[in-house]
């Protein structure tokens, strides 16, 4: 279709106009390139002036020129449309992709499907939300968010049940076909059925994906409008009934907090906390925590609304627009997507609750992909310039080849950031790219993963992130090669490097007190955990405790 369009765009036609001056018959010939971008009136004026044409043909020439441009443009559009239809019929163009593009264009340009005009939420909504979350209406907001979360969770549960039933049904069908393989059916029949099953799963997943996307969009719009309206109503001093309603509202979820907490209690976490001092001249004090926990536990919401759960959620909401943000580090591969591993698990957690303040995780990743594509393009052009400049250094040439080899992916040590308001205890996720080298036992302080941690801590200093959770062993799951000596060496390396980075931080931000949480996988033993806990005071200068006793 693009080729056809280019052919018509480059077409040149000759405009012929015949007129008579006295007894002499004259003819004006002007080549025009279509589509004509210039205004017909302007073009007519230029022709009159350029060719010194008599004034009595001015009106007739203008009509003839306008008619010629209109007829030829219409003919081009008709030919272009015919070529596009032929491309669709011949299979040159993907019909499903074309239909999706048309549906999107129709929804974006048709008034019936257009969203109502909204104020700029970015600043107004942020200020309004910050005021309300620090007012008696805070629990009302959290209760509404929790109701929305339960609604989306139920929708996701229905999706999972339907997908499970489809896979079970397809499994039974495939078993029957495999039993007949070689008798009445061939490999081609099996492949055809497998393709049908895959297409059915894709259609069902797309259907539920669109439904979830629509539901979250509706929830987000309703929530923002409700927050703005509530803020306006609270400004009215005569609205006492609303104030009473807000004060009474919070108690509705408290009746079974303790029982629900016991029912949904997770695997017991191990935790040790330390207060440390860094620096000799410019002394700074920080909090360190060592935890045995799943990294995603800091992201997941719970269906119950117990007091402990609500406290964490309230703290996260209170600090959303503050200078005390919370972040965590996820170790990911070099592809910017959410299709596999912990990336998929994290995206699933993000989808369980509507984000009322930031774009969806998929939209944020699309922006990251565009930025990464631009950065990779710049990197490739610089590598090409370095080669063309005649630099014969072998090491430099290897680096250039390595950059080209990784042209479509980010490199180990690089990271991208996503923002969230819908996660349990964090606001910012650092997606740090690592490779299989982190599983070896010979990485050094100059390893890309370690340098990536340094850059992440620097971003924390410059962007008000005062709490950061780091995987201590630079892995999320244990494997056979990760023996006790391996764990001790890796923990010592990360502890010492982070200590050095935190001392650097004092010069970056003036010595603001921060909390660094070191997480180890849940599969690690208690004995190993306490060995790591005993190692920490040997590397960091831990504050001594004072015991106060009363004299009788």
Swiss-Prot record:
Keyword Secreted in annotation: no
One Gene Ontology cellular component: cytoplasm
Major location category of this protein: cytoplasm
GO process annotations (BP): regulation of mast cell degranulation
Modified residues (Phosphoserine): 79
Subunit structure comment from the entry: Component of the FERRY complex composed of five subunits, TBCK, PPP1R21, FERRY3, CRYZL1 and GATD1 with a ratio of 1:2:1:2:4, respectively.
Annotated protein name in UniProt: FERRY endosomal RAB5 effector complex subunit 3
Organism of provenance: Mus musculus
């Amino acid at each position: 279709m693009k080729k056809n369009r280019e052919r018509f765009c480059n077409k040149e036609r000759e405009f012929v106009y015949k007129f008579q001056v006295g007894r002499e018959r004259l003819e004006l010939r002007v080549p025009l390139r279509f589509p004509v971008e210039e205004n017909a009136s302007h073009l007519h004026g230029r022709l009159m002036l350029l060719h010194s044409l008599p004034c009595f043909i001015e009106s007739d020439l203008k009509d003839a020129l306008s008619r010629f441009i209109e007829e030829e443009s219409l003919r081009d559009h008709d030919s272009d449309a015919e070529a596009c239809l032929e491309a669709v019929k011949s299979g040159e163009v993907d019909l499903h992709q074309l239909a999706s593009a048309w549906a999107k264009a129709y929804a974006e340009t048709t008034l019936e499907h257009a969203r109502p005009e909204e104020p700029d939420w970015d600043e107004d909504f942020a200020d309004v939300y910050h005021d309300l979350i620090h007012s008696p209406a805070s629990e009302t907001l959290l209760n509404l968010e929790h109701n929305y979360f339960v609604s989306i969770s139920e929708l996701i549960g229905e999706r999972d049940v339907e997908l499970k039933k489809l896979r079970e049904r397809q499994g039974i069908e495939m078993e029957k076909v495999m039993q007949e393989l070689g008798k009445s059916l061939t490999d081609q029949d099996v492949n055809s059925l497998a393709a049908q099953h895959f297409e059915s799963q894709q259609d069902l997943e797309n259907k539920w994906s669109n439904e979830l996307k629509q539901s979250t969009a509706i929830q987000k719009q309703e929530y923002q409008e409700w927050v703005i309206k509530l803020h306006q109503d609270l400004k009215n001093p005569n609205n006492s009934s609303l104030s009473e309603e807000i004060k009474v509202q919070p108690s509705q979820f408290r009746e079974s907090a303790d029982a629900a907490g016991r029912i949904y209690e997770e695997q017991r976490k191990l935790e040790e906390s330390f207060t440390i001092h860094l620096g000799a001249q410019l002394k700074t004090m920080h909090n360190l925590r060592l935890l045995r926990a799943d990294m995603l536990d800091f992201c997941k919401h719970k269906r119950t609304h117990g007091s402990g759960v609500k406290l964490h959620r309230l703290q996260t909401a209170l600090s959303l627009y503050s200078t005390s943000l919370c972040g965590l580090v996820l170790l990911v591969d070099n592809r910017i997507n959410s299709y596999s591993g912990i990336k998929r698990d994290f995206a699933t957690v993000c989808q369980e609750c509507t984000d009322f303040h930031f774009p969806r995780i998929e939209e944020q990743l699309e922006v990251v992909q565009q930025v990464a594509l631009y950065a990779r393009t710049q990197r490739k052009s610089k590598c090409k310039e370095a080669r063309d400049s005649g630099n014969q250094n072998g090491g430099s040439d290897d680096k250039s080849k390595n950059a080209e080899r990784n042209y479509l992916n980010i490199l180990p040590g690089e990271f991208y950031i996503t923002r969230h308001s819908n996660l349990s205890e964090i606001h910012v996720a650092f997606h740090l790219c690592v490779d299989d080298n982190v599983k070896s036992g010979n990485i050094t302080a100059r390893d890309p993963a370690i340098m990536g941690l340094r850059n992440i801590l620097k971003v924390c200093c410059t962007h008000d992130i005062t709490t950061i959770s780091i995987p201590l062993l630079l892995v999320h799951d244990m494997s056979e090669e990760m023996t006790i000596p391996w764990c001790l060496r890796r923990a010592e390396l990360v502890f010492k490097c982070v200590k050095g980075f935190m001392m650097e931080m004092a010069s970056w931000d003036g010595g603001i007190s921060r909390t660094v949480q070191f997480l180890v996988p849940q599969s690690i033993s208690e004995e190993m955990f306490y060995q790591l806990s005993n190692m920490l005071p040997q590397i960091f200068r831990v504050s001594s405790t004072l015991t106060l006793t009363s004299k009788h």
